[in-house]
Amino acid sequence: VQKDGTVIDTIKVTIGDMEKDYVSYTCKGELLDMKGVQIPKNVYNYDIVVKKDDKVYKNLSLTRWSEGTSGYSFSALPGTYQFYYGENKIAEITVTDSDVVQDLTMPVKYIKIKMYDAQDQLIPLTQQVTLINQESSQQYNLYGDEDSVDFSIAVALPLGTYQFETYEGMPSVQGKTITVKEDTDEIVMNMNVYKLTGNCKINGESADRSTWINLYRKEETSYLTSCAVDEEGNYVFYLESGDYSVQVSKADATIIAEEEVSVTNASVIQDFDITNAS
């Protein structure tokens, strides 16, 4: 017998009529970090297994893209349920004859990361950020929030030391580490980088997301990173001092423009106004 895609009972069918009633209730709550702080939905990336009678009753996949508001919710029959996050049992909830509201305390710490460039300007991390836990080698793909104004990115992670793997907008962040501690609410990182930004127009119109900006180190002629322009044709990188080659290419990798840029001790603007591009 299933309800909302969840197996709630198994019955044996024999000869003759059978009737069995089920009364279910709602079990719901918010997700809290280990200090009792409510975890915002935009940092969710959790798979929680709910068991009943030593069997999997429900798999809760909670991400920033999940439907509804924050927290968890599912239909439950009367009984006792155990909640697991990885190998950790994080809660046990008993449903009797009414709805249950109980928050789940996750074995993670919610922290805001503030990253500043060499001119003490906050760097917004709006693209995917990849972190690797140095003890477990577990990879975490995180996403910044474009509406964030007082921090670069927020995370809710298990305690430990993490290494930045990739961030296409700032190549030099790779290899940097942060340590998530229970008594830490904020991490400040001072990066020796400067902002390179610009706008790209093609035949008088703002370039679309099929247009890519490719970055090379001039002295090494080696590929460094790339990004697609946004809806208005804008792009942004955060770079260490040096000389760079900036290329504009189409989705098929055809190069339609190229400029050389020197990043010294200030932010740089490099716009492109490309004509006769098909």
Where are these regions (language model features)?
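Hydrophobic loop/turn residues within beta-sheet-rich immunoglobulin-like superfamily modules
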Residues: 18, 75-77, 98, 107, ...
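Structured interaction patches on ligand/partner-binding surfaces of diverse proteins
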Residues: 1-19, 84-102, 107, 167-187, ...
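A short beta-turn/strand-edge loop motif at beta-sheet boundaries
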Residues: 36-44, 120-125, 204-209
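Short, acidic Ser/Thr/Gly-rich low-complexity loop/linker segments typical of extracellular
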Residues: 51-71, 132-153, 217-234
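A short, amphipathic beta-strand motif
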Residues: 27-33, 111-117, 196-202, 272, ...
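Short Pro-Gly-centered beta-turn/loop motif in secreted/extracellular proteins
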Residues: 64-82, 146-163, 168-170, 234-245, ...
